[in-house]
Amino acid sequence: METLFNGTLALAGRDQETTGFAWWAGNARLINLSGKLLGAHVAHAGLIVFWAGAMNLFEVAHFVPEKPMYEQGLILLPHLATLGWGVGPGGEVIDTFPYFVSGVLHLISSAVLGFGGIYHALLGPETLEESFPFFGYVWKDRNKMTTILGIHLILLGLGAFLLVFKALYFGGVYDTWAPGGGDVRKITNLTLSPSIIFGYLLKSPFGGEGWIVSVDDLEDIIGGHVWLGSICILGGIWHILTKPFAWARRALVWSGEAYLSYSLGALSVFGFIACCFVWFNNTAYPSEFYGPTGPEASQAQAFTFLVRDQRLGANVGSAQGPTGLGKYLMRSPTGEVIFGGETMRFWDLRAPWLEPLRGPNGLDLSRLKKDIQPWQERRSAEYMTHAPLGSLNSVGGVATEINAVNYVSPRSWLATSHFVLGFFFFVGHLWHAGRARAAAAGFEKGIDRDFEPVLSMTPLN
């Protein structure tokens, strides 16, 4: 029996002798074969899009309209619902057909990508430089590399504008802050003021500041996409039309592995930011679909017990808790009236069900006594019992279930997965950056392939 280990089946130009990389080094064998590397990337895109389509249809098939999305372990339908597809007032799903269409479109796209990937991996030209010079490249050709960078930036900018167009012209997006409990609406009055948009970038990442993660209205989010899309498109045109300056030519390493390390570093940053965004932000990730944030569940519990004990006759304005601080209400470091108890650390929380009860100095005691609506009680009781805690040690006072409840919030899944992937990508960034710098300095040739242990082992056959 022949295997890829003994080389006879390895395709020309992709074996260990030609490339210096064994089969398990993956795309490293294709560093200088632009046509085959194209095939690998297109096939990979096909796998990604196939997963998206198949998982999308799987979630549609299992979806129960009577239960909230976050109780059903869904991670794709909440994204479609946030874009305004298939939902109505209060985030209620009124039509699952758009979700079905999304899944089918992704499956069809994946078939096209899969065909293209297989074609370029097996049948297409090994290198593109001769037949298709526009698509060909040499890794150390700085001008070509920045042109490719520019094309990528333009595509990213167009992607940002897709969200803008959806929000402005194609039915709008879901706004958790819409009056009456959230609804799909067109975003008409965009925030384009640079002081507001770029002010987010200058905020502290801590506490009540929260950097860009603190954004809490859709006008700012869509306006930010206008700015970002414009910057990406203009930057892309700039990189296509210009050559790298001398300082950039000197400062950067210009090799395939260096570009890989830059990309992994960028994706790592994206992963960490996405982790914080999905964990803390209930505007871009509405609680109706993703479940409450951790702070939101904690504040919801404090609110629920305030409502209960107030009905039982407690004076919530003056009752003292076991620490001598207010049991239900207390003051924040800056003087606002906030919920007391362990949830005090989450006094920054803003949520659509709570804001109507605030006055100019924090929570308004007269509103808490007279204006609490049944929908606010229902919402907070629901959120209190669906905290995204998993097995965190510090739960902000939320009563935790140990045996009975089988519930993991999509926020937990999405935040954890993006943190872990962000960390792994960061390690990959360090690894490939180190190798690329060493290779550029001329003292790193990789592992000595002549004395690898595997070469002295008995062949598998």
Curated annotation (Swiss-Prot):
This is Photosystem II CP43 reaction center protein. Belongs to the PsbB/PsbC family. PsbC subfamily. It comes from the Eukaryota. GO terms for cellular component: chloroplast thylakoid membrane; photosystem II. Binds multiple chlorophylls and provides some of the ligands for the Ca-4Mn-5O cluster of the oxygen-evolving complex. It may also provide a ligand for a Cl- that is required for oxygen evolution. PSII binds additional chlorophylls, carotenoids and specific lipids. Pfam families: PSII (PF00421). Keywords: Acetylation, Chlorophyll, Chloroplast, Chromophore, Manganese, Membrane, Metal-binding, Phosphoprotein, Photosynthesis, Photosystem II, Plastid, Thylakoid, Transmembrane, Transmembrane helix. One of the components of the core complex of photosystem II (PSII). It binds chlorophyll and helps catalyze the primary light-induced photochemical processes of PSII. PSII is a light-driven water:plastoquinone oxidoreductase, using light energy to abstract electrons from H(2)O, generating O(2) and a proton gradient subsequently used for ATP formation. Residues 1-2 form a propeptide. The chain crosses the membrane at residues 57-81, 122-143, 166-188, 243-263, 279-300, 435-459. The modification N-acetylthreonine is found at T3. NCBIfam families: psbC. [CaMn4O5] cluster binds at E355.
